[in-house]
Amino acid sequence: LALTQMGHNDIADSSRPVFDGATGQHEAVAEHGGLSALGKNAVRSINALGGIIDISQLSKAAALQVLALSDAPVIASHSNVWQLSNVSRNLSDEEIDRIGESGGVIHVAPFRGYLFDSSDETLDQAIRAARQVAGITEDFYYPFELYWEIEDEAVQQKFLRTVSDLLGPGSIGDVIDHIDYIVSRIGVDHVGIGTDFNHGSGITGFNDASEALNVTIGLLARGYSAEDIHKIWGGNFLRVFRAVAVSKDKAIKE
């Protein structure tokens, strides 16, 4: 269960504050300072019911509070490494470390919009210019943000093509770089792959599920063993699934 997506809600703060058309700006960076009182109760309730908590897209404060409160391992279903790509929804080293300590799993997302270098000022200005031409706010938390607000379909499609061209194609190597980083910090038992294909990945060689074998080939080339790859392609998630069930049963007995 994810606690938020784009925009804050009554449960938690998001890493992607939503744009408010009425005010002409994004909402405040934080509404609750992480989790609300309702959100903290939600964590306890999800634990008690045997649900898996997904911290992807939570603010850093909210994610760390979930990790401190949860009695069971948690996952990030589709999140990358902030140190390699400083996009607001990607995970800091502190979040990565706490997920490892919880016994959880971080699923790296093969999506170009989460794998680019947002510290590149030239790229940033080019994306802002494209957004201005398309008639949406220049400020953004990820490059394609608010494309759905562009009413003219031709303008919308041109904007999507322009941003895709500016970002350029990502590679399977880019994806595995993030896997490597997580493995180096918390071990191969705590990493997986979480696709986000609803917009296409923008990753050459892994644009949809039919090309998943290319990732396996890339992992082998990086020196990962068959056992490691089994863990990355779902074994780690299944371990968490079982651990959460055990945690629920233990709570019931207590």
Residue ranges and their predicted role:
Residues 207-254:
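Mid-to-C-terminal alpha-helical segments outside catalytic/metal-binding sites
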Residues 17-54, 58-75, 88-104, 173-189:
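Histidine/acidic residue-rich metal-binding segments in metalloenzymes
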Residues 154-180, 226-241:
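C-terminal helical cap
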Residues 4-8, 51, 56-61, 79-82, ...:
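Active-site beta-loop-alpha junctions enriched in small/polar residues
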Residues 1-6, 101-110, 191-195:
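Non-cysteine beta-strand/loop elements that form the S-adenosyl-L-methionine
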